[in-house]
Amino acid sequence: MRILQLSDPHLVAADAALVRERPAMTLLDRALLEGQRSHPDLVLISGDLCQDESWGGYVRLGRLLDRHVNVPVGLLPGNHDDPLLLKAVLGRRFCTAPAELIVQGTRLVLLNSHRSGCSAGWLGPHQLQWLQERLADPLRRDLPLVVALHHPPVAIGHPVMDTMNLSDHHQLAAILQPHAALRAVVFGHIHQHWHGTWPQRPDVPLLGCPSTLRSFQCVQPCPLGRAEDPGGRLLEIHNDGSLSHQVLRWSPC
């Protein structure tokens, strides 16, 4: 089962508008087109979907997804999002966090780390309790598990981004680390490739995703040597339950 992860498109209501000096809509359109070459079974966009948190921005996101994608879609809110508006506009057609998806025997749990008025992330006690109850389901607990959220669940070594990661990351780690079926935790927010682990679970990769819009100063070298290009990530759960992953990059024009 293949998951195409894209992140941080920062769309706005105006089709041709520049965001951070780049054409956000055109770049996400390109990312979806390039990503389909990998033949994913699910598309995940891990937050900061709509820079201006507008109805029009989410409508345009839906149109792009309808144009390019014919597999299940998971959408995560980031700090540059309005989770309620996202759900109102796109929640009937696509899966919005918090939610659980099972695709071809793989379990994907989507978390909402948005906290109103704050750049840092927060899951909160109610969502953490929901997560704990979901993971305890005896009928599903042995399925390969991928957990996705917008904010990094660990410090990545970046002086700015580490001030706005997930504030309740210790509570999340305490819930996730005991689960033998956990294969990966994936996130956005940092606009760059990043690969780390928890010391307690060195077998579980913690994976940051490049942005479809533009990159921030990188902590780790890009495996493809293209740190400035838009990109994404492809994850594959194999028939034996093992996971492989790779960074994807493409030209911005």
Curated annotation (Swiss-Prot):
Gene3D superfamilies linked: 3.60.21.10
EC no.?
Answer: 3.1.4.-
Annotated residues that bind AMP are located at 10, 48, 79-80, 191
Q: Which N-terminal residues, if any, form the signal peptide?
A: none
Keyword Disulfide bond annotated: no
Q: Where does Fe cation 1 bind?
A: 8, 10, 48, 191
> What's the superkingdom here?
Bacteria
Which key words are in the record?
A: Hydrolase, Iron, Metal-binding, Nucleotide-binding
Output the Gene Ontology terms for molecular function. 3',5'-cyclic-AMP phosphodiesterase activity; metal ion binding; nucleotide binding
The text of the family note is: Belongs to the cyclic nucleotide phosphodiesterase class-III family.
**Name of the protein described by the UniProt record:** Probable cyclic nucleotide phosphodiesterase SYNW0868
